[in-house]
Amino acid sequence: MVQAKVIAAALLALGVCSCTTRMTWTKYDMDGHRTGVTAPNADNVPEALGVIDDSCYMSPGGSVFPAGSATYAAAAEMIAVQPEMAPLKQVIGYASHEMLREGPNCALSNWIVDHMMEDVSRITGRRVDVGLINSGGIRVDLPAGPVIKDDLVSMLPFKNYLCYVALKGEDLTALFEEMADRNMQCFGGAKVVIDGDRLDTLLVGGLPVDPEKVYGVATIDFLLDGGDRINVAKNAVELITTDVKVIDSMLPYAMSYAERGDSISYFADDRLVVRGK
């Protein structure tokens, strides 16, 4: 009986504790409000990240953290790798406005896919009518202002290779019908109207697609056979996989703006119209 009473008392105590336990979470933006830290370029590491010695870490905001603290350890690791990261911090251009990754027919995806079409045509010597990439392959936005190499590398981190695929018009139409029904991806060279989940209109070069005509498609190897549930190479008349990665195509293109004295800028247009959603 005594043992039973002890067990009952213990269970009651646990019940009381479980009822009174409370946890709260506070969300802070990663804005450097504790330390004044900002993202460094290759030539401003002390100003952006602060300085460190054997005894303490002094942040850009003036706060001092002793050796052995968690902040000291994090700062030491971040500062130590900066020489290796210096090439990625190289300023390669200037963007006149922010370009957000907002799916198909946003300025950023249009900028990438339209250039990809040009580069695939240049590399393969084939006529390219349509371009196609997946939205998920674009990982971050392009900020306004100075653009560093890491902005592009972080945006396009995957080892996706440029490809050329020749498709008959009926297969190209089927590809866009599937995307309209599931999830439209980023494209160029076409005008698409979606009504609900149904492809209403597909124009290439301003004309309706001819089922028997062969069209050139610029894409990436990830989408050839099932990536993001897309099979661009299904029923391909011709397939060329290049040895050029998307990032290796886009970096020189981004740098070319500064070389000719221009700012990086692009636009959304009317290539995609969605009705009934």
Predicted regions and their residues:
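N-terminal, Lys/Arg- and Ser/Thr-rich interaction peptides
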Residues: 68-95
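Hydrophobic helical h-region of N-terminal Sec-dependent signal peptides
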Residues: 10-13
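Feature captures C-terminal
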Residues: 22-62, 106, 110-121, 126-277
